[in-house]
Amino acid sequence: MCNSGNAVLPAIRMRQPTEGDGYMIVARELLPGVEVLSILPNLPSRAAALIAAQALECVLKAFLWHNGKKTDIRAPEVQHNLVALWKMAYDQDLSIPQEPPDWCTILSSGHGQNSEHGQNFYFRYQEGVRNPPGDQTNIVHGGETPALIPMAVEIRKLIEMVELAVKR
């Protein structure tokens, strides 16, 4: 027997994602890459660290954006500074340790500005820090990365925590 009645479905409503939502989307989408790259043998650890640092930046900015820090996260001294973003998130009551863990500090050292003399972004570019005119010293990042598997686990936990926090 066939029912020929018409069903009335509610209208589908979609909203434009906010910038904060965008940060969360990127963090979530980078996470599988971090997890896979952290366990593959014979792969340079820089690949996992670079993507992990970007995922960490995005998840912290998602939390801060949703907590009204839209302008603060763009300040030059904070923008790519994972330690500063971590501390801001702690100050906004994200349930994380007050002091960033070593893996965060190490990621921060390769991810953003590490010198008053310029933007270094060591994970992205293998360039040295050029000191002020007349000083020919060139400092190159040593390539340190965190222990990858524990880092990936902690980033997953943080993403899950922030997802719950921004839904409140």
What do the PLM-derived regions correspond to, one by one?
Residues 35, 45-67:
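Short, hydrophobic, well-ordered secondary-structure elements
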Residues 1, 39, 60, 128:
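Residue-level marker of positions within ordered structural domains that often coincide
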Residues 2-20, 24, 68-168:
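Long, charged low-complexity segments
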Residues 27-46:
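A long, hydrophobic alpha-helical segment
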Residues 23-26, 51-52:
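Amphipathic alpha-helix face/heptad-repeat signature
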Residues 13, 17, 41-50:
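Short, charged/polar micro-motifs that form catalytic or ligand-binding hotspots
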